[in-house]
Regions:
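Membrane-interfacial terminal anchoring regions of lipid-handling membrane enzymes
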Residues: 1-485
Length: 485
């Protein structure tokens, strides 16, 4: 009997090992096939194990100095501080999975995006990216319109690179945390000021930057609540620039601006409620918000099953020319010898310039163009001919100023019809006679979408800005003047 049990146990063990080997072989083959199919650049360091990255961080001398300083200032033992550091490392460090990113993630992303949007990807000059050196350190910097941005940009660039994003705490919930980490993203506590945490985060960001991991940074540090571009945050980019203390990295570093816009942002009403709550208006409780989300999901599921589903218009991405950082480092040769406040001031200037480049690349989709015309006219009833004329005037002005107008060759009536369907669906605009009535309860949505392109509108910008129905944001946008650098 005992011999039979041992034979059975051995057979199970051999079968388990064989199955594990087979699964491993299948995953490796799937990963290789995915890379060959997309011909994307996947940084070697991205495939390093979490254990090896953790060991490098725990043996980092700068983190060791931060541990001793924290222990001295808080009267906590160094052992307890090291334990906290280990928790931070486990929280931050991802585990990239090629199969998850390309075989699973790409297909799901493509299906979801095609379900909700018609996706447009435009390159300022595609050949510039092909000419980047293989050992270049590339950081994609972008504006932040929606939480769908992560999926949209990853999908748009899947044939070129696999991006590691800095993701906020909102995604640290099952299963989002596991998904983002499998895709190589790392988590950031946006408003956490503890120096020890930032020492760990800085060293991790610099470690992956030195190793050539391609990163994506939302330069505004969070979603725009009023539709305008926000002033840039410098923290993560300052960490990235820190590797240039070694001058051999300076010629290899590039920033690539990316601009994003939508005909409909999925969470626009939630963002407007957050903006209103800052002005003292009551914000719905968690149960009310959950009820609204469930209603939204149920309503759209019913529309999908009834075959009455309609997409939410365009989701557009413009990829700009790579910006080499070597000239900037040459012009700021004393950067790393300056006191920290002065150094951060120089970094802020760089971020402002990059944000201006992003602003100039923002795609103009039909709904923002129509909303800008509606807000510019500022009427409760707008004759169709008047609205079309103003949209055409704005489009011509945008093209003269090198604006990225999506499908600008179309007749303006075709562009408006695409916007009108969405505005009707959102209960913003209702047809009446030979024109349209603007419904007052959704006037804020008009401003939200008009604000996304207001800075591009040249002679029309001042009137659009003056009729904004949204409360002024704390910390004015760098584009509030309407000027594009």
């Amino acid at each position: 009997m005992t011999r039979t049990v041992w034979i059975a146990a051995g057979a199970v063990a051999i079968a388990t090992i064989a199955a594990a080997a087979g699964v491993g072989w299948y995953l490796r083959r799937s990963g290789r096939r995915a890379l060959l199919r997309f011909r994307a650049r996947v940084d070697r360091f991205k495939l390093a194990s979490r254990k090896s990255v953790r060991e490098r961080l725990l043996n980092d001398s700068a983190i060791g100095d931060a541990v001793r300083a924290h222990a001295a200032s808080t009267n906590i033992t160094t052992e307890a501080v090291w334990k906290r550091v280990d928790e931070y490392v486990r929280e931050i460090v991802p585990f990239f999975n090629v199969v998850a990113y390309y075989q699973v993630g790409y297909r799901i992303a493509g299906w979801l995006l095609s379900l909700f949007y018609k996706v447009t990807v435009d390159h300022e000059d595609p050949s510039d990216h092909d000419r980047l050196p293989r050992n270049s350190v590339v950081v994609y910097v972008m504006n932040h319109r929606s939480n769908a941005d992560y999926v949209l940009v990853s999908y748009a660039l899947a044939g070129r690179v696999a991006i590691s994003y800095a993701v906020g705490e909102w995604a640290r919930a099952f299963p989002l945390e596991h998904i983002f980490k499998a895709f190589g993203s790392y988590f950031v506590r946006r408003r956490y000021r503890e120096p020890l945490y930032h020492a760990v985060l800085e060293r991790y960001v610099q470690l992956i930057t030195r190793e050539g991991v391609t990163q994506g940074i939302f330069l505004e540090g969070g979603l725009t609540r009023d539709g305008r571009l926000k002033s840039p945050k410098i923290g993560l980019l300052d960490y990235v620039l820190g590797i240039a203390r070694d001058p051999t990295y300076q010629p290899r570093m590039f920033l690539v601006p990316i601009a994003i816009n939508y005909d409909r942002v999925l969470e626009d009403r939630s963002l407007l409620r957050e903006l209103a709550s800052r002005e003292g208006r009551e914000r719905p409780g968690r149960f009310a918000q959950m009820r609204e989300v469930l209603h939204y999901l149920g309503w759209n599921a019913a529309r999908l099953l009834a075959r009455r589903w309609r997409r939410y218009g365009r989701a557009a991405v413009t990829v700009g020319r790579p910006v080499p950082l070597q000239p900037w480092f040459a012009a700021n040769a004393d950067l790393f010898m300056l006191p920290k406040p002065e150094r951060l001031g120089r970094v802020q200037q760089l971020c402002d310039e990059v944000m201006a480049r992003i602003g100039a690349l923002v795609p103009v989709t039909p709904v923002p163009l129509a909303c800008a015309a509606i807000q510019n006219l500022d009427r409760d009833f707008i004759p169709r001919a008047v609205l079309l004329e103003r949209m055409e005037e704005m489009r011509n002005a945008l093209l003269e100023l090198n604006g990225r107008v999506i499908r600008h060759e179309r007749d303006i009536e075709q562009t408006f019809d695409r916007a009108r369907r969405m505005l009707h669906m959102r209960h913003i605009l209702v047809a009446e006679g030979d024109g349209f009535v603007l419904l007052p309860r959704n006037r804020e949505l008009v401003s939200y979408y008009a604000n996304s392109i207001e800075h591009l509108l040249g002679p029309f910008a001042a009137a659009v800005r003056a009729r904004d129905a949204l409360p002024a944001m704390l910390g004015a946008s760098p584009f509030a003047s309407g000027k594009v650098i």
